[in-house]
Structure formats: structure tokens, C-alpha cells
């Protein structure tokens, strides 16, 4: 399975089009907006995302800059109905089924879960008190059989530091604890732009897929890789 991951385009999604080679899955880990107040930013992203060529399935979540998603969820649902080729996940699971030779569903399916929340971060969207009961509840909702987890923020201690402060992890401790239990094969996040990169530990492939750097310049490319679910091995393109 060929997967491309990206995050934090902040309305500059058109910049990355030529770095999307096509494949099975295209995953976005949030912050498609900038101020978060302009619904035209949502429409612009959805138009673009829908028209990206060469992918079988496309999923995205919101992030802390996506205030409109949190403040006007019903209006956002109405917007998203106009774009049936893409799927938005907010504390939701989707299962990709693969058919056998006679059209029957096989056991070779993939469970994907997406959630936009993070520990309180200034006055942005999808904030919950750090290490609080509500945030713990969001992560407890991640199904135990999740293969691919998409969250906006990173887990504590993994791809979560800012330039000049490598000792000061900004990721979520409760999310890290839940990942240790669920052990998803892939975790995709963004949020901390300078945390961009890849790590593999304890059986999970971690991707911080932020494409804009700290100056909001496009210097960090989407990551595309081939993934074998059975062996959990990946090969970067």
C-alpha cells in the first residue's frame, strides 16, 4: 500500500500539489486553515483535496487553527457534503475493506482513526486541559485495533520539540500513553512544525508531516512510502 502524509498547509495547499505522486491513501493531519475564521479556506482546501489525482482514498482531520470546524460543526458538515471524494474524521474510525476474488470482504482490512484534539495551546481550537479527564477520554476512544492513527498534535517525546529547545517536548503525555497500549502501526501528526520527520519505535511508525517550517515557508515535503501491513515494514519513495 502506498501512502502519502502531510499536515499544516495553513491555506497554502496548492504549493504541495507537485509533491503528491499518487497512491492508495492520502492523509492530512490538520491545520488546513490559518486564522480559522474564514469558511472560504475550508472550501478552497476541499476543492483542492478533492481534485488531487491518483489516490484511492483521502482523509483529513482538523487542527488547532481550524476554529470554524469546532465553532460551526453543522455548517461544516454541509460544506463537506459537497465533496464526496474526501472524508473528514473527527473522533471517528473508518475501515477500508479489501475484496476477495468473488467480491466478498476479506479479513485484510485497515482501521483508520482520526482526532483533532491537543493539550491546551493558547486560545486555539480543539483545546482541552493538559492531562485532564476530557482529554484522556478522547484518547480512550481510540479503538484497540487501530492500524493508522491521525492526530493533529504529536505524542509526548516523539517529534514534538521546537528549534532551540530540544529538551522541551510539547506533545501530549496522555496520547503517548494510549499509543503505547494500542500500538498503531502508523501514527501521523503535525502541529509542531519543527518536529517534522520520522521515527520508528515500539512497533509504531511515527510521522510529523508538517509541510511548513516555523516561518510558514514550504521547506518540508509530504512523505510518501510503501507500507506492508503484514510485516509493518515501510519503504520511502
Predicted ranges, named:
Residues 6, 11-102, 181:
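Core catalytic region of metal-dependent phosphoesterases/phosphodiesterases
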Residues 15-17, 140, 176:
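Short hydrophobic/charged patches on amphipathic alpha-helices used for structural packing
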Residues 33, 38-41, 47, 121, ...:
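Active-site-proximal segments of metal-dependent phosphoesterases and phosphodiesterases across multiple
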Residues 76-86, 169-171, 200-213:
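Short, electropositive alpha-helical surface patch
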Residues 10, 32-33, 64-67, 93, ...:
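Catalytic metal-binding/acid-base residues of hydrolase active sites
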Residues 94-101, 106, 177-182, 186, ...:
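Binuclear metal-dependent phosphoesterase catalytic core
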Residues 107-148, 166-173:
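Binuclear metal-dependent hydrolase catalytic cores centered on His/Asp/Glu-rich metal-binding motifs
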Residues 1-10, 29, 108-118, 147-152, ...:
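Active-site-proximal beta-strand elements of phosphoester/diester hydrolases
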